[in-house]
Amino acid sequence: MDIFLAILPAIFWGSIVLFNVKLGGGPYSQTLGTTFGALIFSIVVYIFMKPVLTPTVIGVGIVSGLFWALGQANQLKSIDLMGVSRTMPISTGLQLVSTTLFGVIVFHEWSTIISVVLGVLALVCIIIGVILTSLQSEEEKNAEQAGNFKRGIIILLISTVGYLVYVVVIRLFNVDGWSALLPQAVGMVLGGILLTFKHHPFNKYAIRNIIPGLIWAAGNMFLFISQPRVGVATSFSLSQMGIIISTLGGILILGERKTKRQLTGIVVGIVFIIAAGIMLGIAKS
């Protein structure tokens, strides 16, 4: 039962972008709707959990939420250019590398020889995985498609910065996840509005995309529930499995077309990235 709870964040988070794309509306309406969904869920959780909200918790939570919105908005823009099945493995790999390096440099997470060896192997696996999932078909090598890929990667780098700050600012100030949930959601909505208001995102698609926001917040909640039961290392490792759902869902559910060579690269690349996530989880423990 505990392992099942720990897998739920991966299931929920892995399906978010599939819902975003299926519900439609483009990256701006999708971002805004998702943030409102997260806010609704967080308000309900706050009513039942009643965590203590200090000025530090509120401030840090809002900043974290603002940067989450930056990460999510740019991830969705990249999906618009490159598709789910290509964007998500690369995005996951970049997030793992950035958060790992930050953890090593700032928090000195790799304190033993075993953790250093596992960590370095994990980073190598991530690089291999990202390269394999980025393989282009001959058709995609034309000028327009190649331009979309380059722009998508640049946008993903911005997204990675957003997700990195979203994660590490909470840890830097040692803020409890339950306490940060509501302020985070407020920051997400503020960030969503600031990033999208010029593009007139307030429409029926924004309302539809409240659903992915509810799903994201539920995944967050199950992560908080599972961590004390299975440990941070195991919950972190299992949460990376969402890449399977999002990537294969992009191909099977959204109908993104891939050559046999690309499919092989994606499957093998996912295996490398998941292996890296597991090794990083062990290195953190």
From Swiss-Prot:
Q: Which parts of the chain span the membrane according to its record?
A: 4-21, 26-48, 52-71, 84-106, 110-132, 153-175, 180-197, 210-227, 232-254, 266-283
* Membrane topology, as annotated: Multi-pass membrane protein
Q: Which UniProt keywords apply?
A: Cell membrane, Membrane, Sugar transport, Transmembrane, Transmembrane helix, Transport
Molecular function GO terms recorded: carbohydrate transmembrane transporter activity
Q: Does the keyword Metal-binding apply?
A: no
**Primary location recorded for the protein, binned into one broad class:** membrane
Question: Which cellular component terms (GO) are annotated to the entry?
Answer: plasma membrane
User: Which compartment or compartments is the protein found in?
Assistant: Cell membrane
Output the NCBIfam families linked to this UniProt entry: RhaT
Q: Which family does it belong to?
A: Belongs to the GRP transporter (TC 2.A.7.5) family.
Q: Report the protein's function.
A: Involved in the uptake of glucose.
Q: What is this protein called?
A: Probable glucose uptake protein GlcU
Question: Per the UniProt entry, what species is this protein from, by scientific name?
Answer: Bacillus anthracis
As recorded in Swiss-Prot or TrEMBL, the protein's gene is named: glcU
